[in-house]
């Protein structure tokens, strides 16, 4: 039997990395922010966790969900577009997790200037606020869509990634480190295929539309996303991109796991959508090293000898790439069915 934990990262909390530390999460009321907050509060003893986000109502809901941790949690209303507010919020913070983004692909296509303000200018504001305060480490969340981007959202995240990697050059003598964590759609996250299918089934639908029968995706749980961020906080020296090793699945197999024997009309690929999620390109592979449960793409720039990240993993073969289409590990229909039980689709 396959369970989600079989693909869990080997996070080592023995060095109590987050104990007595102050951590701020931009976009902290989202699904990642909530899961990260819960994981840290359950496994460490942080000084405080600051949730920095725009929506007062979502903060109110999260405050109620985390009532028992009230003494450890702070809620700041603020936008990553507002550098002054960010700088004030970063005072006294040790680690920043940058999760705030406009991430719905169609919304970004339709409102490109807004996506640029949040995803690109917001990233630069986080960097500037970090350099102006005492923050030690920043981990920015990226996406497979930033790799060979075909839509505006992916384009903005590519620029954001480049900004965070280059930001290490501006740290100078300060002990500051910026790194990136890249993963695909979290299984069951808002706006992804699992809730979409679930809704059709719930409303009595008997067929599940597939954009392209060849389409594949990675399966990553929220827990694995959180653990990869902890891994980056533990190990990053500056400029690395951390990528989880996770299994792939075919969208047709997902449909059969959710509604066995259903009709699957092929409706055509949507604008800005890829057949396969790409995590590491052939070009990236020159600087990519493999570890037990993840890959790291190391930066091409070296800022100073003391800040150089020395790879201890195995260099990947020439011509290597990592996508949901060429993965070595695949989920069967039965395995998908088991993993679906771990997702709360009624939330």
Predicted regions, residues:
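Conserved residues in the N-terminal Rossmann fold of short-chain dehydrogenase/reductase
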Residues: 53, 76-77, 117, 266
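Conserved Rossmann-fold cofactor-binding substructure of NAD(P)-dependent oxidoreductases
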Residues: 74-95
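N-terminal Rossmann NAD(P)H-binding glycine-rich loop of SDR-like oxidoreductase domains
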Residues: 21-41
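Single conserved hydrophobic/aromatic residue that forms the stacking wall/gate
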Residues: 1-12
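Conserved glycine-rich Rossmann-like NAD(P)H-binding loop of the short-chain dehydrogenase/reductase
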Residues: 45-58
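NAD(P)-dependent short-chain dehydrogenase/reductase
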Residues: 152-153, 158-236, 247-261
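Conserved Rossmann-fold NAD(P)-dependent oxidoreductase catalytic core, especially the SDR/UDP-sugar
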Residues: 95-98, 102-158, 162, 166
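C-terminal substrate-binding subdomain of Rossmann-fold SDR/epimerase-dehydratase oxidoreductases
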Residues: 209-347
């Amino acid at each position: 039997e396959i369970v989600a934990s079989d693909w869990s990262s080997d996070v080592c909390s023995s060095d109590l990395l987050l104990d007595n530390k102050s951590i701020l999460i931009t976009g902290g009321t989202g699904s990642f922010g909530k899961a990260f907050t819960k994981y840290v509060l359950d496994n460490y003893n942080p000084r405080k966790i600051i949730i920095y986000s725009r929506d007062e109502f979502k903060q109110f809901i999260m405050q109620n969900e985390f009532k028992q941790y009230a003494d450890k949690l702070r809620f700041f209303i603020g936008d990553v577009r507002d550098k002054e507010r960010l700088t004030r919020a970063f005072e006294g913070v040790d680690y920043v997790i940058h999760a705030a983004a406009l991430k719905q692909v169609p919304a970004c296509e339709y409102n490109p200037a807004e996506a640029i303000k949040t995803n690109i200018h917001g990233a630069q504001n986080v960097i500037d606020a970090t350099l102006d305060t005492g923050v030690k480490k920043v981990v920015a969340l990226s996406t497979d869509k930033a790799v060979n981007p075909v839509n505006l959202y992916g384009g903005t995240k590519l620029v954001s990634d480049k900004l965070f990697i280059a930001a290490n050059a501006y740290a100078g003598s300060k002990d500051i480190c910026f790194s990136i964590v890249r993963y695909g759609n979290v299984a069951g996250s808002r706006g992804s295929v699992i809730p979409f299918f679930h809704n059709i089934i719930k409303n009595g639908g008997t067929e599940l539309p597939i954009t392209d029968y060849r389409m594949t995706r990675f399966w990553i749980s929220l827990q694995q996303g959180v653990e990869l961020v902890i891994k980056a906080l533990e190990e990053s020296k500056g400029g690395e991109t951390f990528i989880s090793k996770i299994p792939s699945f075919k969208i047709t197999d997902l449909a059969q796991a959710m509604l066995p024997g259903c009709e699957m009309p092929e409706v055509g690929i949507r604008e800005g959508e890829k057949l396969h999620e790409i995590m590491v390109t052939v070009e990236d592979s020159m600087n990519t090293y493999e570890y037990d449960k993840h890959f790291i793409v190391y930066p091409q720039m070296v800022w100073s000898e003391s800040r150089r990240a020395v790879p201890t993993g195995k260099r990947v073969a020439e011509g290597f790439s990592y996508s949901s289409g060429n993965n070595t590990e695949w989920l069967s229909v039965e395995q998908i069915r088991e993993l679906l039980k771990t997702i709360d689709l009624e939330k």
